[in-house]
């Protein structure tokens, strides 16, 4: 296939992403994810059932990229660290590569984390741009993670790298990753969490929803940049698991802590 025959496909994993409207007890002064909510009004959206809560990104990732269920693996197993060390694996990347797509992974964290650098090659990705290959200058307020804004240009670079092919790019964010500090680390937070909880928990939720706003801005910026390229493109954004904040089924409007949200965008009408 050529770029004229098929659209670019960008799949974006939103680390620890949860629509805060889904949490019954959580209130805030303004909507931290306006881009996500606007997309929900205009494009396909829904719930995604994931195998993990609070951690274990690689296993949500594995299910999304291969269509295989973690139920067929051992308790606590990470296929990236077991079977994919021995054999390759069909999935979205390999299937799209077989019909002529360029296939790329992009992540602003270490390439060896979850053995991704090996796993992605076994899954049919042509390239993997990890943080070792990026000029990262800014970090999240907890000091732990690269901010996600760098992923806009890094994702666009993958589309530019193959002028004659459509591309499948899988981009993984990290900015909303825990931990969520119990002390106030953002001096004048734009978004303030409220609810029946103590000050430490308030600080944690306030930190989290402000980081949600950062990833929401990343989503908006990525869409703008893709729109400037004048190529047919589909983007899917999805949450890999709920944040590590002790949420229970009864706290969620979905009634299930193993449900996250996804939303799509396209420029094809």
Q: Where is each model-derived feature located?
A:
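Solvent-exposed soluble domains appended to multi-pass membrane proteins
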Residues: 2-7, 11-14, 18-269
